[in-house]
Amino acid sequence: MARKYDLISELYNRTCKTVVSNPQNWQSFLASACRNYKLRYDEQLLVYAQRPDATAVLEIEQWNRIFGRWVNRGARGIAVFADENRTRQRLTHYFDISDTHESRYSRTVPIWDMRQEYEADVIETLESTFGEIENKSSLAEAIMGAARNAAEDNIPDYLQDLYYATDGSFLEEVDNDIVASIYKNVVANSVAYMLSLIHI
């Protein structure tokens, strides 16, 4: 298992660099991540690296117990770290819904779908969670506003790491305020791109 853990660690490190190496790779990653939005970032990276087309992933026990679906014989799991901090060298395996089949106890798998009738409630919840949103003319605009608010509120927690990450890059010579502004724009634009892929 330690050998496989090392291979997945290498894959993770390589993928971390690859997804940010150019805009096309970042967009490709976002296209994968928007389908598995409940996963941690490290899990999303590893799903992208191993099965970028995965639409809904769970562990085998969850497929069986929660949805009454059985994993197909010979299906290959998607290896992810068991815990985010990697304090233990342990992997967990996810399987995509396409790797499963229904049983007589199957329940419908809720693939994320936004209905028009919930739009006002969702916008209200976004505003109560992330603060006042300037443009609420559509759900997409409200989500963009919420993403900007969240980036603005949370960026102080990440600034030191962000400045450290600029060492050795073209951003090293750029003023810290500009780096922070670029980061906020990347977050907001990434959210917008993901939303355009899930057709809100």
Task: Give the positions of each predicted feature.
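N-terminal accessory/interface modules of nucleic-acid-binding and processing proteins
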Residues: M1-I198
